[in-house]
Amino acid sequence: MARSLKKGPFVDHHLVAKVEKAVAIKDKKPIKTWSRRSTILPDFIGLTIAVHNGKQHVPVYVTDQMVGHKLGEFALTRTFKGHPADKKAKK
């Protein structure tokens, strides 16, 4: 179910503060965050945000097409290594 429009998008306050600070001083270093649940706002465009995937921080460069999506969508938590090959098919 989608979030109500009257509530607005959810963004952690500490992330907004870090983004505003980075924009003010024009800092290009990645902003490290564990907040995968935060919605990407237009203020984030052009910044690199390092999103935690459970093991490490994955750098995500924010573009205008990402606005409205969650940060966690761009930092995958699972690695798919493929299904095991069928030994009978190889022979």
UniProtKB/Swiss-Prot annotation:
It comes from the Bacteria. InterPro entries: Ribosomal_uS19 (IPR002222), Ribosomal_uS19_bac-type (IPR005732), Ribosomal_uS19_CS (IPR020934), Ribosomal_uS19_SF (IPR023575). One of its GO terms (molecular function) is structural constituent of ribosome. GO terms for biological process: ribosomal small subunit assembly; translation. Keywords: Ribonucleoprotein, Ribosomal protein, RNA-binding, rRNA-binding. The keyword S-adenosyl-L-methionine does not apply. It holds the Pfam family Ribosomal_S19. GO terms for cellular component: cytoplasm; small ribosomal subunit. PROSITE patterns: RIBOSOMAL_S19. The keyword Transport does not apply. HAMAP family: Ribosomal_uS19. Belongs to the universal ribosomal protein uS19 family. Protein S19 forms a complex with S13 that binds strongly to the 16S ribosomal RNA. This is Small ribosomal subunit protein uS19. It comes from Methylibium petroleiphilum (strain ATCC BAA-1232 / LMG 22953 / PM1).
